């Protein structure tokens, strides 16, 4: 059973927001908890206990001392952000100096933001002095650091055991990892798009577990039992059980108490937003995450109808392939769109980090007659060709595939196969992510005999590399787009090649396949699109912004003097304001939700409507989708002309 795991974690690493912002985000702990956790997975637990914890304690002891003294933003000094090449502090005094600058940078950011808001409120006489704004900025930093140290103190031996093992296994390649039982559960949830529980997302703030979102369709939503902002005080598994108070627990431990198998009950002691306290009985159920699943839109112009399918992930239930999965859903979407009489199809794989390899093979088969889809080579050199053995084709019309730098793994297999068969035009970034490896999940409980330590978790280990049917690997190189769109990452290297210890690219012999039949004039369509892009004002603005992002990334120092810092902020704001013109773009095409997705539950449909409407609106403002539509129209126009040119009149 293959799993082609995606790169969703890596995506956070490349949320480029310019050099000015990137450096202080580590202090905004509430917004970056996941990133902090990911960074810590590279820390050796032994070294942590001996050295890292000592440094953590040291910083915890002196950061408040630094923040007690007002920062002078008139002093001309700067901070070096080239952390990879910085020397370690030689002693405690040097370490403290480094932290003073880091804290000052974060305070300067808060100071500049609050001062801008304050100056705009002059007309309402809601003015604060500069010193008051500076104090408020330091207090905000202090609160964030308290959250960080609290999070650090909640880590248990099992957490550091997991970190220690991952320190070892990630030396082999970036996708081999140890999954503790809790991490394996999250992995399964992400790849299946569902879990068993109450249907609410939680977060921890000020030692309280709070509801951040009620998931549409879940038990809590169905019975209107909880609301955003409610605080869970205690948890019990039965009415007879003494509730367990959870405020001092790690959030993950509290979540474990709340989640459970379908049709079991949990009793939550809840403090409502209005202050009232009550016990709520909830029957757990399977909760589906709608944002994981495929969805589609009908696109119309004056003369034709087209379709677009968005696939966020190649989801599957590994325990039961017959359950809902990406392939079965895509098939339904295609058939639904065909019933509307579409003349072309766009398959949107942007930001799709991967998933199940079997679903990739099945989906590829919807667009080709039977044949090889991908080659898989194991560690021992054994090669296997995974094939579509079904001669039926569900969609044989014009096909466009949208990709970007975060289309990874399984997405790359699908895009590569369709490209090798000349079955689709690939539109998007210069290349996709570049993950060409296959992982298998090994349950360590089945491997280690005589285990007396409980659930040992699993090992996600890289066992194979996959290759295109033309013999090339997507490792590091990804899939090259047939037509490259400018985007904000155009001048930045993003993907597998930027990770530590990636495997090298190589190639093998091609599989036997037939790519002789094209359904459109490939070269003419591409040329037409390139000409449109070169004349398009919006794409020109995007390209200019991408160059600005690259220049900010290359900056190694930032001024800690307010006037210089403000000048840089204003320059960045000016560049961002130029990009806002893209928001004014509105496609001439008409976009509608494909109603095959409607649930039989009317209340569910009503509550999902807002999310559906937001997605449809985003398509109207998506310049990349608009150009994909232009290509589909070109394809059909050329096909019609080819047919007419072959007609003779005697």
Place the predicted regions along the sequence by residue.
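Extended, small/polar residue-biased N-terminal targeting/export presequences
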Residues: 52-87, 142, 149-204, 265-267, ...
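Heptad-repeat alpha-helical coiled-coil segments, especially the extended periplasmic coiled-coils
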Residues: 32, 36-57, 61, 65
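Conserved functional hotspot residues or short segments at active or partner-binding sites
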Residues: 111-112, 116-123, 134-143, 468-640, ...
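PDZ/PDZ-like domain segments forming the peptide/carboxylate-binding groove
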Residues: 52-55, 60, 64, 68-109, ...
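A glycine-/polar-enriched beta->alpha junction
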Residues: 4-12, 19-38, 49-51
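Well-structured core secondary-structure elements of compact alpha/beta domains
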Residues: 92-95, 99-132, 139, 208, ...
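Cleft-lining beta-strand/loop regions that shape enzyme active-site pockets
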Residues: 150-157, 178-195, 204, 210-215, ...
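Membrane-spanning beta-strands of outer-membrane beta-barrel proteins
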Residues: 13-15, 263
């Amino acid at each position: 059973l293959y799993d082609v795991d995606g790169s969703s974690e890596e995506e956070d690493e490349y949320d480029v927001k310019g050099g000015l912002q990137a450096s202080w985000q580590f202090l905004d702990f509430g917004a970056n908890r996941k990133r902090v956790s990911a960074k810590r997975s590279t820390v050796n637990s032994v070294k942590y206990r001996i050295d890292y914890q000592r440094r953590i304690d040291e910083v915890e002891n002196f950061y408040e001392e630094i923040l007690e003294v007002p920062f002078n933003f008139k002093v001309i000094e700067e901070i070096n952000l080239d952390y990879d090449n910085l020397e370690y502090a030689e002693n405690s005094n040097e370490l403290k100096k480094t932290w003073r600058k880091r804290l000052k940078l974060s305070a300067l950011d808060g100071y500049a933001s609050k001062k801008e808001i304050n100056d705009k409120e002059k007309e309402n006489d809601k003015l604060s002095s500069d010193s008051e704004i500076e104090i408020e900025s330091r207090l905000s930093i202090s609160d964030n650091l308290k959250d960080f140290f609290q999070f650090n103190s909640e880590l248990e031996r099992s957490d550091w055991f997991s970190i220690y093992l991952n320190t070892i296994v990630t030396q082999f390649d970036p996708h081999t990892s140890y999954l503790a039982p809790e991490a394996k559960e999250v992995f399964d949830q992400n790849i299946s798009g569902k879990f068993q529980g109450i249907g609410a997302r939680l977060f921890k703030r000020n030692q309280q577990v709070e509801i951040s979102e009620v998931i549409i369709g879940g038990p809590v939503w169905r019975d209107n039992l909880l609301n955003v902002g409610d605080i869970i005080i205690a948890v019990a598994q039965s009415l007879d059980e003494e509730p367990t108070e959870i405020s001092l627990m790690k959030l993950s431990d509290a979540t474990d108490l709340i989640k459970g198998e379908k049709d079991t009950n949990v009793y939550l002691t809840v403090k409502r937003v209005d202050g009232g306290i009550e016990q709520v009985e909830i029957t757990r159920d399977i909760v589906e995450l709608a944002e994981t699943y495929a969805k589609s839109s009908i696109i119309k112009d004056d003369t034709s109808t087209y379709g677009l399918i968005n696939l966020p992930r190649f989801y599957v239930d590994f325990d039961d392939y017959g359950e809902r999965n990406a392939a079965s859903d895509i098939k339904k979407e295609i058939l639904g769109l065909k019933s509307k009489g579409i003349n072309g199809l766009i398959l949107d794989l942007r930001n799709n980090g991967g998933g199940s390899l079997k679903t990739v093979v099945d989906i590829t088969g919807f667009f080709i007659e039977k044949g090889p889809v991908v080659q898989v080579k194991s560690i021992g050199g054994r090669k296997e060709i995974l094939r579509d053995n079904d001669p039926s084709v569900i969609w044989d019309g014009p096909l466009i595939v949208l990709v970007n730098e975060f289309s990874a793994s399984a997405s790359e297999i699908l895009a590569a196969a369709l490209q090798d068969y000349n079955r689709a035009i690939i539109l998007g970034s210069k290349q996709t992510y570049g993950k060409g490896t296959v992982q298998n999940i090994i349950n360590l409980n089945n491997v280690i005999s005589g285990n007396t330590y409980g659930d040992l978790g699993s090992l996600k280990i890289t066992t194979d590399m996959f290759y295109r049917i033309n013999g090339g690997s997507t490792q590091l190189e990804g899939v090259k787009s047939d037509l490259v769109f400018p985007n904000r990452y155009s001048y930045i290297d993003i993907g597998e090649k930027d990770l530590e210890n990636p495997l090298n690219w190589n190639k093998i012999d091609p599989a036997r396949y037939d790519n002789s039949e094209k359904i459109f004039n490939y070269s003419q369509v591409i040329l037409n699109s390139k000409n449109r892009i070169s004349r398009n004002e919006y794409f020109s603005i995007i390209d200019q912004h991408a160059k600005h992002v690259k220049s900010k990334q290359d900056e190694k120092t930032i001024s800690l003097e307010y006037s210089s810092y403000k000048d840089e902020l204003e320059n960045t704001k000016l560049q961002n304001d130029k990009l806002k013109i893209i928001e004014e773009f509105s496609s001439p095409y008409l976009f509608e939700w494909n109603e095959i997705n409607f649930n039989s539950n009317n209340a569910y449909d009503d509550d999902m409507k807002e999310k559906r409407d937001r997605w449809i609106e985003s398509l109207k403002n998506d310049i990349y989708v608009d150009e994909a539509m232009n290509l589909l129209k070109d394809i059909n126009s050329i096909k019609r002309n080819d047919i007419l040119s072959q007609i003779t009149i005697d």
